[in-house]
């Protein structure tokens, strides 16, 4: 649908000097780390990760180790957004499962330490891929990368949320209806101009939600660039801000937007040459691991997923407007609300 939704590794990977509006004094953080992390040593360097438009994320280098600090952004925020406390809770709960997540060291809800609530976790060494075409990889490596990320989301949806203490992490049932309502409210709260396709989707979606219902832990934003790879295996899943209890197929379909949003992913012959599975092949991989039939209502979940990411993009534009965006690249991501909403409505017109 749009080449603008494609991201570039060099632009978003690695760290940079902390943006002026996101700087904080390290003294109180040092005291907090001393109280919560044994043997860390003194803070030597604080850097900001280039990626991550939502919650500002920092690399904290000390004498003996490196850590990642993730905090709420300063300023006016949307209701229930930037929930670092929920991120901390789910990452901590999943640490002993087959889902690869970093070890957490603590949650701090005292604004006086760095200015907003934050949590600290281990720094996971590896590679984050922002370009879904994986231009620096061989066909065999690409196939392995896609196979392994499929395995991880299947593992996540197979975790018994009750056994890991997340029975209170969200409501059970009616996930999609609640999500449509939530993202509609978030979209309208951050609306910067009238978009006809979004208005039509807001009216159409609640009337066409499938009756099937099941509940699992869902990530909410399971993308290639929210994973850390080492030797082409996933060693860390990041950015759990949107996670909750929800519908696994909705979560997986959102993950599959790559095949609908990037032009090169429409060319099956090219994907085959590159070692990348096409949409149906990737969908079948998930079905084989989970036993779930994804053929029914797949297009509805695609429409819902496109609507959701369009609303996320609008939220980014809202933060740009309000001056609270965490990245200088925020606006170029936010403007994708236009092609994404048009793409979603075109599927409605073609299939319903």
Feature-to-residue mapping (PLM):
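Catalytic-loop of the protein kinase fold
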Residues: 217-219, 224
């Amino acid at each position: 649908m749009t080449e603008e939704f494609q991201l570039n590794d060099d632009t978003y990977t690695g760290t940079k000097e902390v943006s002026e509006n996101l700087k904080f004094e390290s003294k109180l953080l040092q005291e907090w780390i001393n109280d919560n992390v044994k043997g860390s040593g003194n803070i030597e360097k604080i850097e900001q990760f280039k990626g991550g438009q939502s919650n500002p994320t920092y690399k904290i280098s000390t004498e003996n180790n490196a850590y990642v600090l993730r905090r709420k952004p300063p300023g006016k925020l949307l209701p229930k957004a930037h929930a670092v406390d929920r991120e901390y809770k789910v990452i901590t709960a999943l640490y002993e499962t087959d889902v690869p997540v970093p070890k957490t060291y603590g949650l701090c809800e005292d604004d006086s330490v760095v200015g907003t609530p934050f949590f600290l976790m281990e720094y996971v060494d590896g590679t984050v891929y922002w370009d879904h075409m994986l231009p620096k990889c061989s066909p065999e490596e690409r196939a392995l990368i896609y196979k392994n990320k499929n395995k991880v989301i299947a593992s996540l949806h197979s975790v018994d949320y009750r056994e890991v203490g997340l029975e209170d992490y969200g409501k059970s049932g009616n996930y999609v209806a609640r999500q449509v309502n939530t993202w509609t409210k978030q979209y309208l709260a951050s609306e910067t101009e009238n978009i006809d396709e979004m208005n039509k989707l807001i009216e159409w979606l609640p009337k066409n939600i499938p009756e099937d219902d099941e509940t699992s832990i869902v990530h909410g934003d399971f993308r290639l660039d929210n994973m850390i790879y080492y030797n082409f295996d996933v060693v860390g899943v990041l950015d759990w801000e949107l996670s909750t209890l929800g519908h696994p197929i909705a979560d997986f379909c959102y993950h599959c937007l790559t095949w609908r949003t990037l032009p090169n992913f429409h060319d099956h012959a090219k994907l085959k040459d590159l070692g990348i599975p096409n949409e149906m092949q990737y969908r079948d991989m998930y079905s084989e691991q989970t036993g779930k039939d994804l053929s029914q209502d797949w297009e509805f979940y695609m429409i819902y997923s496109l609507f959701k990411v369009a609303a996320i993009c609008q939220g980014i534009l809202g933060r740009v407007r309000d001056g609270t965006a965490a990245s200088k690249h925020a606006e170029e991501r936010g403007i994708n609300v236009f092609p994404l909403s048009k793409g979603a409505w075109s599927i409605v017109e073609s299939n319903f």
